[in-house]
């Protein structure tokens, strides 16, 4: 690798939405004591350039955190977030709002999409109640119906109220709580865990097991869109189960980047996002090859490495990243070339 690298193309167009630099259009006030914020009233986004400029002189650890949280408008990210926002607009307007299945390997950006939506539509309290437009639950290994219900109720702050309730009564409590909180979408992370490892998994009529059966009935009762996110096996489950893909027909697959045009395009977008004084030529041949050898095209690993690179460079008061910064960051994090790197 060399410090002198070719300049990135200045004609490449890409938008960046910075989730950490958003402000309410009305300063956080709602229109009345009861009215929740609607999807078309999401937090206003500060321009990417202004957000980046705001942290250029920040301490090294703040600049590193900026890199971890920056939103990159890749095709898959835009498709997923726009679909979720469209689903939120359907809540309360139609009886079958639909849903979405987002799949990708670990670190591809599934949870980051959920974090971005949650940041755009945060909880909003009035004098008399609290609104929660986005409800979230994360499934663990072998999740049960109770795990799903209580996870959502706990997120909404209603867990104690329903702790002793069972069956249909608990489901009704959950549906009522979602309505009271003005919830417009339910985000389910690690949803691949609901695939049974054995037994009912062999039943072609019950591919998603007991929780899958319950989720269908719950959706039909609450009329709120559900977005499921999980590993690629979840996509296979939805493809095979007509009950699932007819209720939640949307599909977004998050890529793991291989060396090529899409990888270079991602690096160009990231280069413009980095809080450094000058371009870092991430898409130049030696840097792109090194970054892929360490990350194998995994977005989470890439952001982690670059955040440490920026931190190292900030300590050195450098205006751009050099070969020494890449190597030192890799050494500090023990992120070496992985098997399968090209």
Question: What annotation goes with each model-predicted range?
Answer:
Residues 2-55, 73, 107, 259-261, ...:
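C-terminal alpha-helical "lid" subdomain
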Residues 39-44, 52-57, 81, 144-151, ...:
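Mid-core helix/loop region of P-loop NTP-binding domains shared across ATPases and GTPases
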Residues 62-81:
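Dynamic helix-loop-helix/coil hinge segments at AAA+ ATPase domain boundaries and subdomain interfaces
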Residues 81-93:
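Pre-Walker A adenine-sensing motif
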Residues 94-115:
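Walker A/P-loop nucleotide-binding motif
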Residues 119-130, 158:
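Post-Walker A helix-loop "phosphate-sensing" segment adjacent to the P-loop in P-loop NTPases
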Residues 132-143:
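A short hydrophobic beta-strand->loop->alpha-helix junction that borders the nucleotide-binding pocket
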Residues 195, 204, 208-287, 339:
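The catalytic "switch" region of P-loop NTPases
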